[in-house]
Each structure stands twice: as structure tokens, then as C-alpha cells.
């Protein structure tokens, strides 16, 4: 097992711009593009290294990444260029006091990662109840945001985009939507955003294609589906679909392979 002590981060009180002392993110350490590959925490093996490339996100069940607040070195050890702040869940039923702790944790992790040279997308995915509080520690002029899309809640995506525009204060926006299916992808296309298809959706689609290509029983005989329909040979392969997971609908060419840089402490 890898020794993570060399990646350890000292417990710190970071600079803040609010009475609740939630850390303030650095404007100079926000992503300038959506670095690929776009990786979901816990999806790859523990020893996986991004080697200063790509973007790491946390749009999965909380239990899969709960330990990253106590052990942020787990993130540093993966060596991403960018991260999306950990999405500690905030629901309508979440008490405000508990929700503030969740917001503190993700913003602390974000600031700590910036200190380590990792650029940070602000996570906007939360219950509307927390939309305003979720901006504590996000300075005006911040331009890089990400959210989780849901196909039955496109109106939430639209509102979160308006929040991002308000914070960016007229500056060019880098906005990424992770998942949500065709309704969210269409919204991204209409509004010039970046859409990321989750790996699980790509794999499920590949499995459906594989089943279409399988031989089928037909009057007691095994007949190839591709013999019945040669176009099935042209269905995309898994590798091709993986390569098309991140789609940039903006006119800014906002997808890049890598943009890691070292940062000074602060």
C-alpha cells in the first residue's frame, strides 16, 4: 500500500471573507479549462494516478468519499490538475447547522487543494434551500463551476447557471454539467456549456449495443444480428464512446488535456 504521508496537509485556518470563517477560494487557482480525463472519485483503482492531468469529481454517494476531509492527502495522491469540490449532500431536509458543516468541509478541501497546486471548480449541486449559503467563501469574479445534472430537474440546472453568472460578474464562464441525460445535454448545447457523460452511462450503453450484436435464436438457428443488419457493425465501440464523454458546446474550446501548475502556499 502506498505511503500517503508525503502528501499530508497540515490542519489550517485559511483566510476567510465571511463571519462563519468558511475558507475563501483563490481566484488565481481556478480552472481555465475542463482538463480531461474527467474522473469520478472511487471509480478507478486506489493506486490510479492522474499525473497532473484531468479533473476529479465527487458526484457519487457520500460514503465513498467521506474520509477525504480527514485525509485530503488521498486527493493529492491522485495528482489531478483540477478537482470539483466534494459534493457533501445538502437536501431540503438537511438542518442548516449541519449543512454549514458540509459547506465548510468542501470549501476547506478546495482551498487546501489550491495550496497544493490543484485548481478548483466550485460545486453548485445542492438543494435550493442552500443556494445562498453554498456561495460563502466563493469570491466575486470566480468563473469556474460544476454541478450534477438530473433529467427531471433541468430547472435546477438553469438556476445554478444563473447563480454562476451572477458570481462571475460579467466575466467569461466555465460551467460543467456532469450527467443528467439528454435533457441536460440539450440545455448545455443551448447555453454553450460543457457536458460530461458519466462512465456508468457509457458502459451501460455499450452493453446495450453488445446485446444488439449478439447472435439470436431464430427458428432454432443461431443467426448473427449483423448479418440481418450490417449497420450494427458501425455501432460505436466502448473506447470511442469513452473518448466522447466530455462535450464542449461553448465557442471557447474549453477542454484541455492538462493545466497543472505549482502554487505558493496561501
Give residue ranges: language-model regions:
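C-terminal accessory extensions appended to soluble enzyme cores
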Residues: 1-30, 190-266
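Non-transmembrane, interaction-prone segments in cytosolic or luminal domains
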Residues: 27-51, 91-105, 111-114, 120, ...
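A sequence-composition feature that detects small, non-aromatic residues
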Residues: 35, 44, 77, 81, ...
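Eukaryote-skewed repeat-based solenoidal scaffolds used as protein-protein interaction platforms
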Residues: 49, 65-209
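Non-catalytic, usually N-terminal nucleic-acid engagement modules in DNA/RNA processing proteins
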Residues: 4-77, 84, 94, 185-187, ...
